[in-house]
Regions:
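Short, flexible segments with low predicted structural confidence
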Residues: 48-49, 141
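Glycine/GP-enriched mid-protein hinge/lid loop-to-helix segment characteristic of carbohydrate kinases
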Residues: 2-8, 12, 16-19, 77-79, ...
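Glycine-rich phosphate-binding loop and adjoining helix at the ATP-binding site
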Residues: 12, 16-25, 29, 33, ...
Length: 177
């Protein structure tokens, strides 16, 4: 495909994240209108999410978005009228690197992503590894930090994400100031 436009919209996590998919749908409809296109001009939507995702489009919790278990692909497809495929954002990043980036010379690879959270994308023989309940590569919530007093977004204490994510680094720096 050809990238026609790239923008960012705010992620409204209030109301349990229930506004996120409607916001995305409205944004997509606005972009299509701006470009004099219709949903028939779009083959599909691919969306990477920060959490465990199953191949059928079900999100198995996206803690940072406030989501529980539901079929996000079906919901967004119903809102837009366009077929949707979802996946873990770290797996999607790893696939991109595997196809056209630094991993293109290998059959298998692991990619670690660091941002709001910490994730891992695992590619085995050219295919993403999903694992049990879509949790393969979900390294951000491994309990690695002893003595952490604050709870992680997942409710546990001592997760790697609490100190190694961009959010965690800022939190640690603020504590030290």
């Amino acid at each position: 495909g050809e990238l026609l436009r790239k923008e960012e919209i705010p992620t409204r996590k209030d109301e349990g994240g229930s506004l996120i998919l409607p916001d995305i749908s409205e944004y997509i409809k606005g972009v299509l209108a701006d470009m004099n296109m219709t949903t028939e001009d779009v083959a599909g939507i691919g969306m990477g999410l920060p959490g465990a995702c199953l191949e059928d489009g079900t999100v198995n919790k996206c803690i940072n978005l406030g989501w529980g278990v539901f079929n996000a692909a079906n919901v967004l497809s119903e809102l837009t009228g366009i077929p949707v495929k979802i996946g873990n954002d770290a797996n999607m990043a790893a696939l991109g690197e595997f196809w056209v980036g630094g991993g293109s010379e290998y059959n298998s690879m692991v990619m670690v992503t660091i941002g709001t959270g910490v994730g891992g994308g695992v590619i085995i023989d050219g295919k993403p590894l999903y694992g049990f309940n879509g949790a393969a590569g979900e390294i951000g919530h491994l309990p690695l930090v002893e003595g952490e007093t604050e709870s992680c977004n997942c409710g546990k204490k001592g997760c790697l994400e609490q100190v190694a994510s961009a959010t965690g680094i800022v939190r640690t720096a603020n504590r030290m100031l």
